[in-house]
Structure formats: C-alpha cells, structure tokens
Amino acid sequence: GMFDTLLKEDQIITAVRFPIPKRAAYMKFPNPASRYAIVGVLVAETPSGVRVAVTGAASCVFRAQTMEVALENEFTADAIALLTLDSTEFNEDIHASAEYRGHLVNVMARRAVSAII
C-alpha cells in the first residue's frame, strides 16, 4: 500500500535508477480546484518494453499491463481504444465514480499515446 516498501527494518535504499525512455508522455485529468490528477497516465516506450503507469484511479500507482501488451503489438491509440480496466478497486468520491475513473484511464492513455507518435 501507500508508504510501504519491501525493505526490512535494517535495510536502506542507496540508489534508484530509471531507464531513459525512448519516448514518453503523461496526461492527466485534473481536479478543477486542486489541479491534482483525478486520473493521470504515463505511457513510455523503454528499452525493456512499453510501460503504462496510472495514478489517481486506485489507492496507489499501478501498471496497466493489458494496455502495455496491446501497445507492444501496435503502438497506436486505436490499439487500446476498446480496452477496459476492472474498476471495482478504483477510488470513488465526489469528483469521480470508480467507473468514470476507469473510463478516464483509457482516455488519458490514448491521449498520451497520440502525443508521442
């Protein structure tokens, strides 16, 4: 969950390395008052493959692996247009229902792909 790691009590992180993506884009649907992402999606083409990371939709950031697989096969917005994510565990509040957040994940992912092709 949030603020948890797999580190043991006597361990410490000494470095974090992120591969430089070949191309990437981040799109968010902001809350109109705070500008925080109701849903945000990063799509990146890295040396080890396509990565799709989602924030705001669930209790913590997660990878949308079904989208990653689809984009590996065809890197176009159309390749993920018909995909739906299981939104049963998504956040739900006065700003967006879980189902709407699921819809926003797809929309923001398609916009991110379109921005980098």
Which role does the model predict for each range below?
Residues 1-117:
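C-terminal structural segment of proteins
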